[in-house]
Amino acid sequence: MLKLYISMFLDSTEHILKEINRLQHKEQRTNGISCIPLIPLHQAVEARNLEVVEALLERGHNVNETDHRYLTPLHIICSHPNKIGMKEVIAEKTKRDLSSYEERAISEACYNNDINIFKMLLLNDGNRTIDDVQLCTIDYDDSIDTKIIKLLLAYGADTKIKTEDKLKTALHYASTNKNYKLAEYLLIYGAEVNSPDIGNNSPMHEAVRHRNEDVVKILLQYGSNTDHMNSCGTTPLHISVGRVLNRNNYSILKILLEHGTSVNIQSSILGFTALHLSIHSEDKLNLLLEYGADPNILNFEKETPLSMAVKVTRYDINIYNRLIYNICLRAFKYPFIKTTEGYIKNMTCINGYPKCKSIKDACEYEIKNLESIKLSPRFSMADFLKDDNSLMMDKIINNDLIDYYYSFMDSFPIYGNIVKKSIDTAKDRYLLIQGAIRSMDNITFPSQRVSWYNMPLEIKHDIMYLLDDKSLCNLIVAEYDS
């Protein structure tokens, strides 16, 4: 079957089909040693030979048959080129060890999902160089993969079949593939988006691990559970901040957070939050804090992100700054946390390091100064730091003192921008509420049957306050549609 496998890459459809007919009576379909498929349909799919795949399906070849590697044709088309199998083929064909050029070319083929490189190697041209490999990659058309998967699915390929050894579905393999259309077609045809493998990894775990942003987005569209834990006790969020994936995965982390993944979920084995794992990366740490990551959570070894960071002196001072800024802000916003074990651990850690204590003192000093800037007997500029201040801001946003003190916020380097952002948000929402009130007034013109028009303005305002921004916008749009 080795000869047929090589033929799948190099020869005409007519020649291949004749060879299949010739070998049919002595077909070898199982071999626990070989890393290449031994079933003709599986070979054709692995060689990305569209014409032969179509011909074999028309002949009635079993689209859901598993080979000795436990793979169906659907698993194969969603996988990267068979690196180990190609090494086996070239070694057997040439009767020698692979050259460094061949080793590198095969790795290049797998990384770029490019079957053309395999074809080039099988031609056995001794004058080829790695530059030829890179040029070859530019010309590869992965739409062939898409055409093959559509063909397999049209002939009844089952998206739910799992490999016997690792319990992986085709979607697990597609989630590692740069061609996001493979995953999309599988989901259209009913693939289970949260199906676990033997390690309880979902397709989302695989997509995040391989930094496959397009597939991450598609999986989310089909309802992927981003809080699903694998057998190592980690979610896709934990994977996205890990050191192993330090490259090119900030955007994936942001996508997961925007979609509402649980930012403070702890791994089930060591109790790490994503924030614990992000102390090596200022960008990721800042993003997690922006989405509500709690720096006072203890892992199972009773360590907070800060207590872990101070033990490693190589971390940038900005890591300590961002964590302590947030710890102090949370203590101001939620005084009850001062009695929690995590906060006490952080304070012990901060007070034990002069550099950290000076940061904490600066935070508390700035908050105290903001509290001293009074807007009314009840409210100060520091109230704009609180999460539960929306009603307060709504009531006093037109206070002239706010505009006056707004320009002074640049002199508050730690929390000034938070205050300014809260003020801007409150003003935008106030204008939105006023616009919605006007639209409602215009829609419900004076009539004895309409009670809205005769309501006091303050009551109208309180009613509109209960609506979110999207509902307010829809109400304004409704005026122009009516």
Swiss-Prot record:
Q: Which UniProt keywords apply?
A: ANK repeat, Repeat
**KW tRNA-binding (keyword) present:** no
* Ranges: ANK repeats: 36-65, 69-100, 101-128, 129-161, 166-195, 199-228, 232-265, 270-297, 301-332
Q: Which domain of life is it from?
A: Viruses
Q: Which InterPro entries match?
A: Ankyrin_rpt, Ankyrin_rpt-contain_sf, PRANC_domain
Pfam family example for this protein? Ank_2
Q: Which PANTHER family match?
A: FYVE-TYPE DOMAIN-CONTAINING PROTEIN (PTHR24118:SF100), POTE ANKYRIN DOMAIN (PTHR24118)
Protein name in UniProt: Putative ankyrin repeat protein FPV232
The scientific name of the source species is Fowlpox virus (strain NVSL) (FPV)
